[in-house]
Amino acid sequence: MRTIRATIALLALGFAASLAAAVHLVPVVGGLASPVFAGNAGDGSGRLFIVEQGGVIRVLQSGAATVSVFLDIRSKVIAGGERGLLGLAFHPQYASNGRFFVYYTRSGDGTIIVAEYGTLSDRNIASAIETTLLAIPHPINANHNGGMLAFGRDGYLYIGVGDGGSANDPPDNAQNLESLLGKILRIDVDRTASGLRYALPPDNPFVNTPGRDEIYAYGLRNPWRFTFDRVTDVLWVADVGQNAREEVNMPVVRGGNYGWRAYEGSSCTGNDPPLCNPANYRFPVLEYAHDEGRCSITGGSVYRGNRQSLPGGTYVFADFCSGEIFAWDGTAQTVLLDTPGNISSFGEDEHGEIYVVDLGGTVSRLAAATSCTYAIAPARETFAIAGGAGSIAVTAGDSCAWTAATGDAWITLGGAAEGTGNGTVTYAIAPYTGKPKVRTGTIVVAGNTFTITQNRLRLLVRGGG
């Protein structure tokens, strides 16, 4: 039975209207080099780890404004386009064992590597010792590398691998059960099997049957980002489309076939018309067309945070090309925010708050819009004939933006005349030789009016209130 499908249309529903007005982005850190992922270690430290495509993982301490290097493997990585250091996952017992895992494309031949690392006694610095778990050949095309790693509640490591690239998956890797390309894989990193540095979960769907034992689900084009709902443990996979459709698959289940390359979203592609039998596939719960500048989905997190920034269970995702951030509650969806960036990923902190990663170099937190109040001091000033300069102190909440403006040509505002949170507006007053003897002007700061009086007397009187 087909699951419910939805298209990204702006719906005039209470859900859409309320969410669009309810959230904003709070800058966390900038100056990064092509960040593609952010996440937490689950160790209670409050740290945020940020993956840069070129081969560096940086760590942001709780409450800090700058990052430090956690791991640098640039010498191992080929980066650019869809290649690079692409994924990071911490072992569920990282707090005690210091183990974590990375996904990258290897310099020289483009092979996809899933590798294990550890940390030094200083948990802010990783060991340089690498243990390669998987090496998946990807020699021909530079695109569709996948790149996501995440642990499920079952303790197994899930791995998202692209179909090998080029248009329309020419070798049909996504449907080939003897290939690891175009799949979600699942492995046990706490045990080993003969000839492997990992073990196979005994309930993987193709254990002891034709097909690679590592495969968990298949029929995917480029599952760049996926997430587990931290409450239900349901697996959501956002699959990047070809030329027409972007899709979200949920639940992604053991042995599920999600249709590529026979289907793109719920539409038969024409690549294999005889195979377009809906009974053989699981279809997306959500899909959208390539219009209005949209072209590539970036999944996605299910909001379960403590700050109540969004209703619990809301799925948040984006389009890399349009910069839009979307929200979906299972029945209705909306454009949550329209950003100017290229959103490469979402991440979560230990408390379930969602972070937005922009390939341009920033990480921001999705937060409930603040009810902002503003105050200024003083409220007025008086100047004599010679004019002069002054300043206005602005008091505002940390994430509350404000601007200052004047319509009087003899008042000149200094600096940017805008800010966020507490700040200062500076201004200059021109000499006055005209008529009448007194003139009055105003500066409006965040809705508050600051009044300036100037007269032709040479006595300067200044006061506030």
Please name every model-derived segment.
Residues 2, 7, 457-465:
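Enriched but not universal
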Residues 7-18:
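Bacterial N-terminal signal peptides
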Residues 20-168, 225-228, 233-241, 293-330, ...:
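Acidic, Gly/Ser/Thr-rich repeat motifs that build Ca2+-stabilized beta-propeller blades
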Residues 51, 83-85, 93-95, 163-332, ...:
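Beta-propeller domain segments
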Residues 332-350:
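Conserved blade-ending motifs and adjacent loop-strand segments that build the rim/top face
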Residues 375-376, 398-426:
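Surface-exposed binding patches on compact interaction domains or structured appendages
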Residues 377-403, 455-457:
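Solvent-exposed, low-complexity, repeat-rich "mucin-like" stalks and linkers
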Residues 437-447:
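A short beta-strand micro-motif common to beta-rich folds, especially ectodomain repeats
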